[in-house]
């Protein structure tokens, strides 16, 4: 029994150590409140990491896997997430001015109450994403897949949504002043005034 108890204790200690072990990539320690401005994390596997409160301004995370990550209240100013996987990631209350999310996978990600003025979201996958109360002023959403996305009370002032797919999206209370809405696909889309737009549904 003592041998079994000792083995269980050792296993628990090793498990705890592994859980607390921190990954360091190119000098950047992956942890809460990490200070890694300009870091090169391209192609890194950072799945389910906790980067809440981190400073990743100007960092290169192109092609990185950040699925399921927690990156709340972080500074992602001008960071590069092109072609990155952020599906299911939590990025609420995060500052992302000028961030590059082109062709990134943000399916079911939470970007609520985040600040993304001038962000590049060209051809990004925003299916089922939550962008409620987000500041998307001047963002480029050209060709983005926003099916089922929620933009409730979001600011899309001067945003470019050319060829964006808003099938099943919710835009209740969203501000679309001076937004570019050329060839946008509307189907079962809830508009800012709560009306349903089915103009793009296949007949």
Where are these regions (language model features)?
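Tandem repeat scaffolds
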Residues: 20-203
């Amino acid at each position: 029994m003592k041998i079994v108890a000792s083995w269980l204790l050792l296993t628990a200690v090793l498990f705890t150590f592994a859980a607390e072990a921190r990954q360091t990539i190119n000098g950047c320690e992956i942890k809460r409140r990490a200070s890694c401005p300009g870091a090169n994390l391209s192609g890194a596997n950072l799945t389910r990491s906790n980067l809440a409160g981190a400073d990743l301004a100007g960092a290169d995370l192109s092609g990185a896997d950040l699925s399921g990550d927690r990156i709340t209240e972080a500074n992602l100013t001008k960071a590069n997430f092109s072609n990155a996987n952020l599906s299911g990631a939590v990025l609420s209350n995060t500052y992302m001015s000028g961030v590059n999310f082109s062709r990134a996978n943000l399916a079911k990600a939470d970007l609520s109450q985040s600040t993304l003025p001038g962000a590049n979201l060209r051809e990004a996958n925003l299916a089922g994403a939550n962008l409620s109360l987000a500041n998307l002023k001047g963002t480029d959403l050209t060709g983005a897949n926003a099916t089922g996305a929620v933009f409730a009370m979001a600011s899309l002032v001067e945003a470019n949504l050319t060829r964006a797919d808003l099938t099943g999206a919710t835009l209740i209370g969203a501000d679309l002043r001076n937004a570019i809405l050329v060839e946008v696909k509307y189907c079962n889309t809830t508009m800012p005034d709560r009306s349903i737009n089915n103009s793009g549904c296949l007949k």
